[in-house]
Amino acid sequence: MTAGGSRRLPRWLTVLLALMCAVGCGSPAPQQRRVTVWAMGREGAVIAQLLPEFTKLHPDIEVRIQQLPWTAAHQKLLTAFAGEATPDLCQLGNTWIPEFVALKALEPLDQSLARSTAVQASDYFPGIWDTNIIGGTLYGVPWYIDTRLLFYRRDLLAQAGFAEPPRTWEEWSRMLAAIKALVGPERYGVLLPLNEFDTLLVLAIQQPEPLLRADGRYGNFRSAGFHRALGFYREIFQRQWAPPVDSTQISNVWNELGRGYFSFYISGPWNIGEFTRRLPPEQQHTWMTAPMPGPDGPGASIAGGASLVIFRRSRHKAEAWLLLEFLSSPQIQKRFYQLTGDLPPRRSTWRAPELAGNLYARAFREQLERVKPQPKVPEWERIVSDMRLMAERVVHGDLSVEEGAADLDRDVDAVLQKRRWLLARGVTP
């Protein structure tokens, strides 16, 4: 007992208490930041495989992924927007971007882009980058590209007397006629399923006139260019170069191309893998890809695919942008291509041997320099559906080209009535 009645603590206990205080009373551990990501389909499953490297770079950021089926994604996003429950970062189909911009749901990305050294607009194919610019503002960064071009039987083309694929509509017409003469009445030159809009849309965007006029207020389907596209589309069926069937009547497009039921097929990059897997080894040398022919030379195609967007209500925009930059890097895009077969939107990624050395992908690389965005109005998916229905009636002879174009213009003008009303009052729809 010391003076004053207090008891001195043993030295070992004093040291222990000091250590405990140093551990327990020091600076708190950094708070874990959380980023929620929504992605669709196969991409939603694959993205998790890319994240370990991001976690190493940013250990204080937790990434939570929700995978959505494409069939339910659009409605779930709208429901989440209405309930103020949108994710931080999201994969968004390029034709959906105008709709969510109209809802004021997306965060403008121009300032983030200006500060970024990882995302360089000049490295992206111009047509796909442009799909994300609405009213002069950037709302997304392309994640992967989906476009359309020719898959064809080069052996049958050679038998018909042609050494190279077509570069113009006129050349393509001559090839289709020659193939039809070669294969007879039970087979065809090309398959253009009537329940798919892609082919007519590609032919239409190859024209100099836009599909909508007056800043998307009215249809422009009475234009000479659309008449030309629709007329050529109808001619392919009239001359029996294509069977008037839809995709449900073709049990297996890979086998049908393999057996020569048709020699040309317009499709997207996923079919590189499908034809490679499904055709037997002895037929692998018989097929190839080629860019779309155009009215007077190599033609444009659609700039489809998906982009990465940040929702305006996100509380973690800086962290979401870091993840967006990571997923947009050429190295990660290369790995993403290896896992999914999705085509990267950056030119620099295409220097990777997996892409540069892929004979079937080379035509896509050339085509990507000539892709065009579809009209940037929220109503576009409804419009393109109406276009497909009209085209089917023209093919079956229920409407002439002139009647079909006029009917479509009237229908589209009705669809765009609300847009005109809003624009007239200074509201951006």
Predicted regions and their residues:
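Short, well-ordered beta-strand elements
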Residues: 31-42, 61-66, 88-89, 188, ...
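Short, polar/charged alpha-helical segment
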Residues: 42-62, 387, 405
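Extracytoplasmic "Venus flytrap"/periplasmic binding protein-like
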Residues: 53-124, 133, 158-160, 164-167, ...
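A structural signal for short loop-to-beta-strand junctions that line the ligand-binding cleft
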Residues: 79, 87-88, 117-156, 187-189, ...
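Hinge/lid segment of periplasmic solute-binding proteins
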Residues: 94-149, 201, 284-290, 354-359, ...
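Extracytoplasmic/periplasmic solute-binding protein
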Residues: 134-143, 148, 173-219, 262
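Glycine-centered hinge/linker elements that transmit conformational signals in sensory
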Residues: 176-178, 215-247, 292
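C-terminal lobe and pocket-closing loops
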Residues: 269-284, 295-389, 423-429
